[in-house]
Amino acid sequence: MFTLTATRDRDGKNTKVSASHRQILIDHLEAAASRNGLVIDQLGDGGHIYLRGEAVGTWEVSAS
């Protein structure tokens, strides 16, 4: 199993979701970000989340 953790920079609040494959989590993140006007970048197993060009959070996928 793998866990995706997304953390908001403003207050450190985070959310987690798990799946059997890493790519499922990344695809879910990309779809959710797109629906909410966010953009993500990918640096290995993590990256940043942007809103209107400003970094507003981070995300990472880890084996659980």
UniProtKB/Swiss-Prot annotation:
One Pfam entry name: Phage_Gp84
InterPro entries: Phage_Gp84
Domain of life: Viruses
Protein name: Gene 84 protein
Biological source species: Mycobacterium phage D29
